[in-house]
């Protein structure tokens, strides 16, 4: 069917800020979809309040609204723009749920907006557990014995009939939110109660557990002609019981017989046809490895996390094709852009193995429950491509950046067998490494299979790696042969691991390996197992077979951008935005842009972003291999976050020069003693501090500086390991806490709780350009990534802005650096101090780019290649402030991470961010707080009761807020009047204000309990003050940046 001509404009709903279960994959999908629609001459109107996304660029959409993802907000946009169609299946669960509410409210019908792609009826059949189960019964497709419940009592009755364990799956939630496996009635009551509260339709599916079965996924496409294909099938190494987002996944499936593969493929095609889905769909099965009986677990009637993985694993652009199908095209009419010869109806085939490995946040969030179940906890993931499973696993582990260059976590080697078995049976994020450790100690494959139900095929691969490890340990670099080294490399052992095993330097292994002729070949991802010639410049390394890499004759300078790896707390999608724009700017300036990265969720790993893409670990060995095979002229590290910065030393030692910076400059800013020395040399005040090499020195330093103090490790992201101590007892307790590994040397800073603000700076080595300043709402001591912030600064006096500009200029002139950097200041006691200088693009660069409509990354590329600030047409100094306010607000994933205290501290906890823009500040804050349909605080919806636990140290700030709260009609409850548990059980409970004394964590249990009951928790009075100021502000009109920027 040809493209429809009656659709001229389409509203696309984005997925909003990153939360666990909904990350960068929807930026990739959304950007692809928007570009696909624009290729067809469709006007694209986008609503998405995530500023760090590529899809919110002017190049992706004709009109961009950074507005709340609520029914009221989207209704206003529809009223203003009058789109012909709405595309909601590319915005994750957020987009689907919002589309459903718009339809139920009659808004789509009232404004004659057609839901494109998958019909609403099909969405409901896939998402509504009761409708889905009924349909599967009609199709005779087996589902686990189950019951739909709307109350806890119904759940208990079902469990009493079928027995425990029971799996709970709430309807219309994200990443398994609210779900879990209940081993007892007590656990069932707790999980179902939470699940019903999280489900927008107050519905849960509870089913007899089939934990231990194989979990298999199919990614399927269908067009309106009923043509269907399977794009990719994937197998979870972890059996059913661990959320697929927390499972190690391989593609294609490794343990299915052809009969099993075809059986599940046929079922997938039958299901997508019956549901009537147009576009992409993810279908998950459980397969009994003994009886071959299968059960359908669930269907995602939208582009999903697995879609992004399948797209990168195969090269088949699922989101792009889904967008075209929504306009009426058939699969047979769309060319596959990878081959440019075959059509989209041609099923991909793979001649390699793909391994996806989750990246969890437990290295930062040490007190969180690490146990894995049906509720997702990973913040991101990595993908590795190889010719065998063993090498794929090794590559994936090395891509995680978890301080290991092999297959062991050093801490586990000290554990007793009994301790290892606990995490193997219960499954937490260390399970894979615990299994390997047990295999090292001689535990049999059969014993591990019995306890985990992981297929013996996978365990045999694990055991093979352990056998090779032992063999390598008995070798030496001097005696190694070419064949032996080739074998070790073929199975994925890194140069760094070999160097460590043989007690030699990394450069020694590299030199010997190259002398023996053991070098990687590069293979192409082509969707067709080399059956057709591919045009895509998308490569992975292997140590077997011939080289597919055919480089064009070198007519341009080649520039390598090192990406930022997996999404994690402290290093998110913002850095991918920077990498993507870096590549685009290089190509526009007649350079060949090359990207190396390993995150399957991102736009940077789309094969169309750069001239060539390498899907590799971000380690010195792998980056050097690419530099050598490409004969790279320049390397950029400042766009890839701390990951890329961390590679500078190893690259420099290998003779690679870095654009704009050196390791010496990085050390000058990251090493705190050198940093203080540098600050003194440029005559800029800094926070007083000392470096401690031992615990004794730490206690002495704290005593001499004076409490409160802030512990600050060097070379970390997201404030990892930071801690504020108000006295010696707190500091001693922190040092003794087994959950924290205090690594020395460590910096001891004085803690100044003043007004914090930050600047992003572009420098050509002489002049500076500051696009804006962000003033933080919360005082210094709350990590900048977890602070709300406003630009332009609403309370900062002109003299302090000028002082900051002067200090910035002095720092830029003194540090032999070109490009983007970030400075954080604190104003305390009428004195301005520098907290830190980050020699790279920061997480606020995309926000300033969006809020000012300035191409900051393009400017950065120009500066790196010799242009001055003046030659860019920019006025040196501080850009004129905008006549509107942009509020940046952090977004947390507390519901997914049991045990995480929502207290704002020095260590970052947020997983994403959003922006809200308005001409007046209260309206901007209102949009920031009430940013999503399900996320609007209860405080904004009704006038209930607020429970207050505020330490007396804050009486001066607290009493005026208390009066305002009462004047606005809210009731205030204290512990003297009512117990917390009694208040929480009341229908009026809407908000807990829990602010312990500085440095204290009292009230943690109450904060956690309030979160479980979906009650708003506020732990900082400055945040609460902003909430109160905008409580009675009406929802503002949709705000378009060009309206103001052009005037």
From Swiss-Prot:
MGS-like domain sequence ranges: 937-1047
Essential cofactor(s): Mg(2+); Mn(2+)
Region described as Oligomerization domain: 402-549
GO molecular-function term, one example from the UniProt record: ATP binding
Region (Carboxyphosphate synthetic domain): 1-401
Keywords on record: Amino-acid biosynthesis, Arginine biosynthesis, ATP-binding, Ligase, Magnesium, Manganese, Metal-binding, Nucleotide-binding, Pyrimidine biosynthesis, Repeat
Matching Gene3D superfamilies: 3.40.50.20, ATP-grasp fold, A domain (3.30.1490.20), ATP-grasp fold, B domain (3.30.470.20), Carbamoyl-phosphate synthetase, large subunit oligomerisation domain (1.10.1030.10)
InterPro entries: ATP-grasp, ATP_grasp_subdomain_1, CarbamoylP_synth_lsu, CarbamoylP_synth_lsu_oligo, CarbamoylP_synth_lsu_oligo_sf, CbamoylP_synth_lsu-like_ATP-bd, CbamoylP_synth_lsu_CPSase_dom, MGS-like_dom
Residues binding Mn(2+) 4, per UniProt: 836, 838
Positions of Mg(2+) 3 binding: 824, 836
Binding-site residues, Mn(2+) 1: 284, 298
One GO-annotated biological process of the protein: L-arginine biosynthetic process
Annotated spans, Carbamoyl phosphate synthetic domain: 550-933
Positions of region (Allosteric domain): 934-1047
UniProt function note: Large subunit of the glutamine-dependent carbamoyl phosphate synthetase (CPSase). CPSase catalyzes the formation of carbamoyl phosphate from the ammonia moiety of glutamine, carbonate, and phosphate donated by ATP, constituting the first step of the biosynthetic pathway leading to arginine and/or urea.
Domain notes: The large subunit is composed of 2 ATP-grasp domains that are involved in binding the 2 ATP molecules needed for carbamoyl phosphate synthesis. The N-terminal ATP-grasp domain (referred to as the carboxyphosphate synthetic component) catalyzes the ATP-dependent phosphorylation of hydrogencarbonate to carboxyphosphate and the subsequent nucleophilic attack by ammonia to form a carbamate intermediate.
Descriptive protein name: Carbamoyl phosphate synthase arginine-specific large chain
Organism in which the protein naturally occurs: Halalkalibacterium halodurans (strain ATCC BAA-125 / DSM 18197 / FERM 7344 / JCM 9153 / C-125) (Bacillus halodurans)
């Amino acid at each position: 069917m040809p493209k429809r001509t009656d659709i001229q404009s389409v509203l696309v709903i984005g997925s909003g800020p990153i939360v666990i279960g909904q990350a960068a994959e929807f930026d990739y999908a959304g950007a692809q979809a928007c570009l696909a629609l624009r290729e067809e001459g469709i006007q694209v109107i986008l609503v998405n309040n995530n500023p760090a996304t590529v899809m919110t660029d002017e190049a992706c959409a004709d009109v961009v609204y950074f507005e709340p993802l609520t029914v009221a907000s989207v209704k206003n946009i529809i009223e203003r723009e009058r789109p012909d169609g709405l595309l909601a299946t590319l915005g994750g669960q957020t987009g689907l749920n919002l589309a459903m509410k718009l339809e139920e409210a009659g808004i789509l019908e009232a404004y004659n907006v057609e839901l494109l792609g998958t019909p609403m009826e099909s969405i409901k059949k896939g998402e509504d557990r009761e409708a889905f189960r009924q349909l599967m019964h009609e199709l005779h497709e087996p589902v686990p014995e189950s019951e739909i419940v709307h109350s806890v009592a119904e759940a208990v009755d079902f469990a009493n009939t079928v027995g425990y364990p029971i799996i709970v799956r709430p309807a219309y939630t994200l990443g398994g939110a609210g779900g879990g496996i209940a081993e007892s009635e007590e656990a069932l009551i707790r999980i179902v109660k939470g699940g019903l509260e999280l489900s927008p339709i107050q519905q849960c599916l509870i089913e007899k557990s089939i934990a231990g079965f194989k979990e298999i996924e199919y990614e399927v496409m269908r067009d309106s002609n009923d043509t269907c294909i399977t794009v990719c099938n994937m197998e979870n190494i972890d059996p059913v019981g661990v959320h697929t987002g927390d499972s190690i996944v391989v593609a294609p499936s490794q343990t299915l017989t052809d009969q099993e593969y075809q059986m599940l493929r046929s079922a997938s095609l039958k299901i997508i046809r019956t549901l009537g889905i147009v576009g992409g769909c993810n279908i998950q099965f459980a397969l009994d490895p003994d009886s071959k009986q299968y059960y359908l677990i669930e269907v995602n009637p939208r582009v999903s996390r697995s879609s992004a993985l399948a797209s990168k694993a195969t090269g088949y652009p699922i989101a792009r094709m889904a967008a075209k199908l929504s306009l009426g095209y058939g699969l047979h009419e769309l060319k596959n852009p990878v081959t440019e010869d075959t059509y989209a109806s041609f099923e991909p085939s793979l001649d390699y193995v793909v391994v996806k490995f989750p990246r969890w946040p437990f290295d930062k969030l040490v007190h969180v429950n690490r146990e894995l179940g049906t509720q997702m906890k990973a913040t991101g993931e990595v993908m590795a491509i190889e010719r065998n499973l063993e090498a794929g696993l090794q590559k994936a582990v090395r891509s995680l950046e978890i301080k290991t260059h092999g297959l062991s976590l050093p801490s586990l080697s000290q554990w007793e067998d009994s301790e290892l078995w606990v995490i193997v049976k219960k499954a937490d994020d260390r399970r894979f490494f615990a299994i390997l450790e047990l295999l090292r100690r001689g535990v049999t494959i059969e014993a591990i299979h019995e306890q985990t139900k992981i297929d013996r095929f996978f365990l045999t691969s694990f055991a093979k790696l352990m056998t090779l490890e032992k063999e390598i340990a008995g070798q030496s670099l001097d005696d190694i042969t070419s064949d032996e080294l080739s074998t070790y490399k073929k199975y994925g052992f890194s140069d760094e691991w070999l160097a460590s095993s043989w007690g030699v330097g990394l450069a020694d292994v590299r030199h010997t390996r190259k002398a023996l002729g053991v070098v990687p070949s590069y293979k192409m991802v082509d969707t067709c197992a080399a059956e057709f010639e591919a045009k895509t410049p998308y490569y992975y390394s292997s140590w077997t077979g011939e080289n597919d890499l055919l480089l064009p004759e070198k007519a341009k300078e080649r520039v390598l951008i090192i990406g930022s790896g997996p999404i994690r707390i402290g290093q998110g999608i913002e850095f991918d935005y920077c990498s993507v724009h870096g590549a685009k700017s290089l190509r526009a300036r007649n350079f060949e842009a090359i990207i190396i990265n390993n995150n399957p969720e991102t736009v940077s790993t789309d094969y169309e972003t750069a001239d060539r893409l390498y899907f590799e670990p971000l380690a010195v060995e792998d980056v050097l291999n690419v530099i050598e095979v490409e004969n790279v002229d320049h390397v950029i590290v400042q766009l890839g976050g701390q990951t890329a910065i961390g590679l500078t030393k190893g690259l420099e030692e290998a003779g690679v020069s870095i654009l704009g910076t050196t390791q010496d400059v990085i050390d000058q800013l990251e090493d705190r003693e050198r940093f203080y020395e540098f600050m003194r040399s440029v005559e800029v005040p800094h926070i007083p501090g000392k470096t401690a090499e031992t615990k004794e020195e730490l206690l002495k330093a704290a005593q001499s500086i004076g409490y409160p103090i802030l512990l600050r490790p060097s070379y970390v992201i997201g404030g990892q390991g930071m801690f504020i101590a108000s006295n010696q007892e707190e500091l001693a307790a922190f040092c003794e806490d087994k959950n924290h590994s205090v690594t020395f040397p460590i910096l001891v800073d004085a803690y100044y709780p003043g007004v914090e603000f930050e600047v992003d700076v572009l420098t050509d080595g002489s002049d500076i350009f500051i696009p804006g300043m962000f003033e933080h709402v919360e005082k210094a001591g709350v990590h900048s990534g977890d602070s709300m912030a406003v630009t332009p600064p609403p309370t900062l006096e002109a003299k302090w802005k000028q002082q900051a500009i002067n200090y910035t200029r002095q720092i830029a002139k003194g540090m032999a650096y070109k490009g983007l950097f970030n400075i954080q200041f604190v104003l305390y006691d009428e004195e301005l101090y520098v907290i830190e200088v980050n020699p790279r693009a920061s997480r606020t660069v995309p926000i300033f780019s969006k809020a000012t409509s300035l191409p900051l990354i393009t400017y950065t590329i120009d500066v790196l290649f010799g242009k001055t600030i003046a030659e860019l047409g920019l006025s040196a100094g501080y850009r004129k402030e905008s006549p509107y306010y942009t509020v940046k607000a952090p977004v947390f994933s507390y519901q997914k991470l049991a045990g995480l205290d929502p207290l704002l501290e020095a260590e970052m906890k947020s997983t994403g961010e959003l922006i809200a823009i308005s001409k007046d500040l209260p309206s901007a804050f209102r949009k920031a707080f009430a940013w999503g349909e399900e996320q609007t605080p209860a405080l904004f919806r009704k006038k209930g009761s607020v429970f207050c636990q505020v330490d007396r140290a804050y009486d001066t700030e607290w009493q005026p807020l208390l009066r305002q709260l009462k004047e606005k009609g809210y009731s205030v409850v204290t512990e003297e009047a009512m117990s917390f548990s009694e208040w929480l059980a009341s229908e009026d409970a809407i908000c807990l204000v829990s602010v312990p004394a500085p440095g204290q964590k009292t009230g943690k249990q109450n904060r956690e309990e309030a979160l479980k009951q979906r009650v708003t928790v506020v732990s900082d009075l400055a945040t609460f003050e902003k909430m109160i100021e905008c409580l009675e502000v009406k929802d503002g009109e949709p705000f378009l940046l060009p309206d103001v920027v052009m005037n």
